[in-house]
Amino acid sequence: MLPNGEDDSDLLRLVKELQAYLVRNDKLEKENHELRQEVARLRAQVSNLKSHENERKSMLWKKLQSSYDGSNTDGSNLKAPESVKSNTKGQEVRNPNPKPTIQGQSTATKPPPPPPLPSKRTLGKRSVRRAPEVVEFYRALTKRESHMGNKINQNGVLSPAFNRNMIGEIENRSKYLSDIKSDTDRHRDHIHILISKVEAATFTDISEVETFVKWIDEELSSLVDERAVLKHFPKWPERKVDSLREAACNYKRPKNLGNEILSFKDNPKDSLTQALQRIQSLQDRLEESVNNTEKMRDSTGKRYKDFQIPWEWMLDTGLIGQLKYSSLRLAQEYMKRIAKELESNGSGKEGNLMLQGVRFAYTIHQFAGGFDGETLSIFHELKKITTGETRG
């Protein structure tokens, strides 16, 4: 047994070590949370850009597909005579200098011999010598060609199906380039008008940017390939248009999320777990959206200012402040559901359910910067349940 003084000193030492570990643990958890938020912000930003790019690509793909379908229908009517003509030629005309794709026979198991050397009469006074590497390379090529039976028919001519595929691909590519050139010439004056309108565009509210971007996309939707056509216009303000689209997309997502939260209604038929998970999921999405916007604000704010794009909506006095305030509705629904469960099931009063409700309320309180009168009243009602149980 140690004296009481030594016991007290050991106890104090252990308490201090425990406190130090707790502080360190809190610090690590905070850093981990910040890293998760940063990763979520980057993923959201990438997702925003990908979604907008996919929308534009799908629109262009539909137009390309419709134009290709029309060209393939016309091309198929013209390709049959070509293939017949090529087959006929292959049977009537024989080239004295055989090629692997014309001289091959289906029954041959060995590659054909190399072409004979020309006679000395044709050589004149020039001196020549045999080159073994030419023979080896020729035999290697002919051996490889002999294994391509699926592409060569019995007469040694490429099959009509293979011909059609090759011709179809060439025609499609040629038509695509032709359509780009045609769009460049046809819409030249209209695109010059769009350039002047984009360069002169100024906005006082972010909702005006949404409308303007929608109009620009509609005006450019008739182009077979927007990027390919606009490359022919050096004065096209690409950076400003991209910034406008980015701002509209970054504003649209949190705005829609805020509307979803304001219209949220708890379904009494849902179980307690389902109801609380729905509310928690909305709050997680809300925090992620707000954090992403706040972190993006410093990097994009200056660029938006340069292009006269409204950026004040990213401040607490704008949309971000409205989103934080909308989280109070989630706190109200969460606490109401907890209180209802506690009142109907007394056994849960001393469990973790009350702590769960208070913890969520505290999280919203810190996120929104406080409670309004209605939310505070619901909190007091929840608090009374605990007080009543303690007195009982």
From Swiss-Prot:
Tagged with keyword Zinc: no
Listed GO CC annotations: chloroplast envelope; cortical microtubule
Molecular function terms from GO: microtubule binding
Compartment(s) where it occurs, according to its Swiss-Prot or TrEMBL record: Cytoplasm, Cytoskeleton
Listed InterPro entries: CHUP1/IPGA1-like
Region (Disordered): 65-128
Keyword Cytoplasm found: yes
UniProt entry keywords in alphabetical sequence: Coiled coil, Cytoplasm, Cytoskeleton
Coiled coil, from the record: 11-52, 269-299
Family indicated by similarity: Belongs to the IPGA1 family.
Summary of the function given for this chain in its UniProt record: Microtubule-associated protein probably involved in the regulation of microtubule organization.
Protein name stated in the entry: INCREASED PETAL GROWTH ANISOTROPY 1-like protein 1
Protein source organism: Arabidopsis thaliana
